[in-house]
From Swiss-Prot:
PANTHER family: INACTIVE RIBONUCLEASE-LIKE PROTEIN 9, RIBONUCLEASE
A molecular-function term among this protein's GO annotations: nucleic acid binding
GO CC annotation terms, alphabetical: extracellular region
Function: Does not exhibit any ribonuclease activity.
Source organism of this protein record: Cebus albifrons (White-fronted capuchin)
Underlying gene: RNASE9
InterPro entries per record: RNaseA (IPR001427), RNaseA-like_dom_sf (IPR036816), RNaseA_domain (IPR023412)
Protein keywords: Disulfide bond, Glycoprotein, Secreted, Signal
UniProt xrefs under SUPFAM superfamilies: RNase A-like (SSF54076)
The protein's name: Inactive ribonuclease-like protein 9
Amino acid sequence: MMLITTHSLPLLLLLLQLWQPLQFQEAYYEDFYFPAYSDKEDFEDFMVEFQSTGPTRPPTKEKVKRRILVNPGMPLGDSGYCNYQIMRKNVYYKYSCVTEHYFLLMQYDELQKTCYNRFVPCKNGIRKCNMSKKLVEGVYCNLTKASNIPLCQYNSFYRRGYVLITCTWQNEMQKLIPYPINDLVEPPEHTKSFLNEDGVFVVPP
């Protein structure tokens, strides 16, 4: 691990580009986290995406696993969950904080299967989303402070519900990629409620 606090961010990024291919390990710039990468190609992809001024790159399986999926360990109900994971997984848009984000405790294959489930309304009521068939544990992150990295601050909300996603076709893999996450819908507390064909929870009389 290395701590650097005396250089500007652009200079640091340049230094890291020269240094990283020789030694892959974690590095910090104040509160900004540069993760370990297994090879030079992974690191270069991260740097290109971070510094790019053009359109956002299409989602990939690796990007979904890196930015959205989490493993058991840190309690999902921890109030600092989002601040830690957002920084650790580099969930940013260019140099800006994302306004909201979801972390899901599930395997990629299970999330990818959701792309083939029936359509339901998204939380904005406009686009079509696919909904998971099973309840999933996760964390909803809502930006509360700052707009540029590394000063992003988030509120963390534990949820257990149905995942709503939109999926993008990936030509190289010839598969649908489950990205982005639209919502994590908690079911009503009433145990007899169920989902109708429109994806709406219904409580029988």
